[in-house]
């Protein structure tokens, strides 16, 4: 079975799985959260986050390879660090998926209502639109997980085409005075203090760790293909993010982000700022298509993951009745939160970053340290000895401190 998987899938497939998982609607939060730090410091902290998340992923892979193919994250966590940490990990995974579902309901409501308003002249209520999109996605998941996967794949293909058209155009229109913030009233001020408030969102932008067990099922224990998938998949995401920052911060002045942030920082506000740069009709159309598809594909991906996680957690069967129960568990809590607090996209992504710090940063580092003691002759060990796990844990603690510093208004905020 493993040999057939190795022949069937090249490392390119794994690279696309990793990159496709992390690149989505969450990328709209990056320029908003990094507006204070602006391009050069923003790029710097994004690279730091990529380095740390790449190595936490490799540490998770290191621990995973000591167990039979198909072993779940729960199995490995329980065996190496005990049931208490396994429960903590399970709670954080569920919270991350729930908060991301809420964030994408919010983003869908905002961007689709804005698209309707711009093209049809009808001002749709974002809350109603958000709930309607949630009902649509819930209906698809109730019918079939395969249908949701196929729709996500279709959206991904269209998203790539529209991305190339739109940002190929914006790339050649970058104004270096805007990129350097030379014309701003705040030009010359320090950008460095603003990097800390963006750390949780930068971390959440590289959350591919849930795919590692799936990659091992696909490739078996061919560590060369697994390592290439993780390294080049996350590196591709980093390059696209840097390109995205270059295009956004080279076209939209830093001062304009204050209005975006004050309006809640949702996807529609950023898109309207892009449209204010006076683009041709085809570029405007492709920008709207890309924005809608980026959010929609992430929404399908996250809710599919949450649906499967809850079905496994509560041992709910795959009948229509069972799937209906799982759909209710998946969508009701975030939908109710959305009705109470509709403009929570940025806060949702940041909150996901906090919880992802535990299960995707700190726990993988601890698992690798424990695995090295339990399996001294393991087949793969991340370079750097115990220094790399220590750096990863330090990064995780820093992100947690920054998140709380942001919540309690200790850190400086832009806007």
Curated annotation (Swiss-Prot):
Major location category of this protein: membrane
PROSITE patterns in alphabetical order: AROMATIC_AA_PERMEASE_1
Induction description: By tryptophan. Is subject to catabolic repression.
Residues in the Cytoplasmic compartment per record: 1-11, 55-86, 149-153, 213-229, 308-326, 370-387
Spans traversing the lipid bilayer: 12-32, 34-54, 87-107, 128-148, 154-174, 192-212, 230-250, 287-307, 327-347, 349-369, 388-408
Pfam families with a match to the protein in the record: Trp_Tyr_perm (PF03222)
Gene Ontology cellular component terms for the protein in this record: plasma membrane
Membrane topology: Multi-pass membrane protein
GO biological process: amino acid transmembrane transport; L-tryptophan catabolic process
Alphabetized UniProt keyword annotations: Amino-acid transport, Cell inner membrane, Cell membrane, Membrane, Transmembrane, Transmembrane helix, Transport, Tryptophan catabolism
Periplasmic side of membrane: 33, 108-127, 175-191, 251-286, 348, 409-415
Subcellular localization, as worded in the UniProt entry: Cell inner membrane
Molecular function terms from GO: aromatic amino acid transmembrane transporter activity; symporter activity; transmembrane transporter activity
Annotated function: Involved in tryptophan transport across the cytoplasmic membrane. Plays a role in transporting tryptophan which is to be used catabolically.
Family note: Belongs to the amino acid/polyamine transporter 2 family. Mtr/TnaB/TyrP permease subfamily.
Protein's UniProt name: Low affinity tryptophan permease
Species per Swiss-Prot/TrEMBL record: Escherichia coli (strain K12)
């Amino acid at each position: 079975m493993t040999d057939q998987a190795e022949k069937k899938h090249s490392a390119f497939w794994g690279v696309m799985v990793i990159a496709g998982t992390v690149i989505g609607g969450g990328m709209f939060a990056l320029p908003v959260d990094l507006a204070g730090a602006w391009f050069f410091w923003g790029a710097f902290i994004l690279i730091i986050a990529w380095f740390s998340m790449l190595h936490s992923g490799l540490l998770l892979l290191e621990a995973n390879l000591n167990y039979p193919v198909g072993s779940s994250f729960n199995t490995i966590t329980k065996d190496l660090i005990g049931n208490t940490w396994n429960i903590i990990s399970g709670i954080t995974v569920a919270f991350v998926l729930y908060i991301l579902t809420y964030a994408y309901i919010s983003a869908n409501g905002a961007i689709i209502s804005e698209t309707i308003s711009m093209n049809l002249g009808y001002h749709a209520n974002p809350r109603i639109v958000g709930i309607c999109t949630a009902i649509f996605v819930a209906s698809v998941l109730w019918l079939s997980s395969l249908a949701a996967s196929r729709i996500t794949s279709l959206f991904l293909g269209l998203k790539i085409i529209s991305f190339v058209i739109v940002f190929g155009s914006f790339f050649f229109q970058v104004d270096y005075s805007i990129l350097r913030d030379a014309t701003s009233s705040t030009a010359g001020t320090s950008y460095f203090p603003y990097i800390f408030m963006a750390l949780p969102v930068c971390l959440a932008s590289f959350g591919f760790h849930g795919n590692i067990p799936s990659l091992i099922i696909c490739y078996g224990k061919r560590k060369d293909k697994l390592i290439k998938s993780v390294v080049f998949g996350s590196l591709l995401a980093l390059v696209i993010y840097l390109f995205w920052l270059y295009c956004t911060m080279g076209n939209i002045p830093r001062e304009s982000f204050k209005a975006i942030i004050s309006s809640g920082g949702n996807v529609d506000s950023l898109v309207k700022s892009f449209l204010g740069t006076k683009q041709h009709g085809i570029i405007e159309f492709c920008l709207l298509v890309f924005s809608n598809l980026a959010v929609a594909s992430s929404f399908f991906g996250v809710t599919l993951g949450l649906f499967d996680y809850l079905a496994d957690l509560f041992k709910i069967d795959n009948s229509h009745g069972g799937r209906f129960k799982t759909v209710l568990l998946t969508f009701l809590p975030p939908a109710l939160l959305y009705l109470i607090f509709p403009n929570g996209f940025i806060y949702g992504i940041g909150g996901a970053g906090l919880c992802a710090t535990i299960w995707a940063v700190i726990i993988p580092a601890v698992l690798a340290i424990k695995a090295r003691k339990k399996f001294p002759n393991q087949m793969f060990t991340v370079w750097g000895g115990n220094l790399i796990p220590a750096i990863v844990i330090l990064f995780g603690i820093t992100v947690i401190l920054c998140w709380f510093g942001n919540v309690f208004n200790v850190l400086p905020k832009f806007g």
